[in-house]
Amino acid sequence: MNETQIQRETRQVVEDVLEKTNLKQGVLFVLGLSSSEVLGGQIGKESSQEIGELIVETILGILGSRGIHLAVQGCEHVNRALVVERQVAEQFDLEIVSVHPTLHAGGSGQLAAFKFMQDPVEVEFIKAHAGLDIGDTAIGMHVKHVQVPIRPILREIGHAHVTALASRPKLIGGARAHYPQDAIRKS
């Protein structure tokens, strides 16, 4: 698998999702990543630390330049806990849990987050404003309501299927209520 191509595809998809979601500085963005799927394998079966590092480092750079906080979701072996910076956990009052990821429990993305973040910790649950799912890892439990599917510019990174979610405020009030337009809500 060509690492330059994976990095280029990752950059394209993340920048496209950020443009479509119009995220503001200071919000949370969740990443679900199967390096096995990126390489054309089955999720959890052919994990690659190198691919995890390539993708997470690329995404951290893009989000960091915009002041958006990355949360990297682990697999079910760590109950889909997430790696964030300690400062983010404290700022959002997230519950820190005791686990250190491995390649096959947490996954390559979490290992990469531990490598590239300044002071990484694992947290049990977040409510992100948006997220990217590389390889059908199921990020929905960590994206706030109301979730809106986003179609990224590319459908795959490497061989992995790619989807994205954004969120919008709930519409309440009924027939007489009026709602402001937003870029995410469908007509």
Curated annotation (Swiss-Prot):
| Recorded superkingdom | Bacteria
Entry-linked SUPFAM superfamilies: TTHA0583/YokD-like (SSF110710)
Specify one Pfam family. DUF436
Q: Which family does it belong to?
A: Belongs to the UPF0340 family.
Q: What is this protein called?
A: UPF0340 protein SPH_0758
